[in-house]
Amino acid sequence: IYAFVEIDSSGNLVVPAPSFLRSMVRLKEEKPELLVIAAIGGWAADGFSDAALTPTSRYNFARNVQKLINDYKLDGIDLDWEYPGSSASGIKSRPKDRENFTLLITALRDVLGPNTWISVAGTGDSTYINNSVEIDKIAPLITHFNLMSYDFTAGETGSSGQKHQANLYDSAVSLPGYSTDRYVRNLINAGMPSEKILLGVPFYGRLGATITKSYDELRKSYINKDGYEYRFDNDAKVPYLVRDGEFAMSFDNEVSIFLKAQYVLENCLGGIFSWQSTFDQANILARAMYESINNPVGYAQELEDTFGPIPQS
């Protein structure tokens, strides 16, 4: 997935780095089975509320998306509107955004046809499900739902930020009401088929609202270095760092990704994805994702040789 294509108030689309997107598409010459998807929007990306407002604006946007797909020979698009009905990121919002988002996706499916990839990136908390997206109505229209099951502490400061940002389950070190499993259950209960849910994992660490470090940075300068001690929360199924006795960083590693991949398989989810590949230049976590899905028995043994006994998912 290429992130991000920009959208303006008229529903026009701009590709900030067209040569990079074209280079991604060229990879299909070597791997024809590869799908290349363009993500539209992102945090603080304005324009969606206007694009979704009227039948004319919706179909104008859909035709612009069709042109983008044709011009770059893409397999589809991912809609990353953060979030319908909310101006928390500084974007324009309207009370009818929730219903209009469904109509926007309907127009896209009408223009793009039944086989083009259309996914939606979103969360699974009750506010999102109740106020931002009609999950049961968009479910038949989309190919997949990219569950952003991370950044749980992105709005937290102080001691509230000293919690896991992407825990699989609840624990004493997680924010009440926030877990990947809870998000998945909320989505399924709201009408999203499990096989359409793609589970997201972060390739970075977070402490509260403002401090983030790529996995490359964590591996080279933080994990068991400079006073930072590695620990693993067997309840939450994720690692974290402690410094001077205090929670210092939440992150995912090979073990937690393996456990999340097993969760995907055990719960018949559609797959797993990451945000974002540039934070893992050594492809350590990317390999963990691949091996955990495609070679779980062999990879589990490899992890045990490195980390010791692996907790049950």
Descriptions of predicted regions:
Residues I1-I69, Q162-K163, S174, Y178, ...:
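Glycan-recognition patch characteristic of GH18 chitinases/ENGases
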Residues I1-Y2, L74, L79-W81, V120, ...:
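Conserved beta-strand positions
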Residues S9-S19, P84-K225:
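Substrate-binding surface in catalytic domains of secreted glycosidases
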Residues P32-V36, K73-I77, P114-T116, L141-T143, ...:
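Short, well-ordered coil/turn segments that N-cap beta-strands
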Residues A38, L79, L108, F145, ...:
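Conserved, mostly hydrophobic/aromatic
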Residues I40, T153-D170, S174, E195-Y263, ...:
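Glycan-binding loop/region signatures in secreted carbohydrate-active enzymes
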Residues L53-D71, S126-K137, T180, V184, ...:
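Short, acidic/polar
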Residues N64-P95, D151, F273:
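Active-site groove signature of glycoside hydrolases
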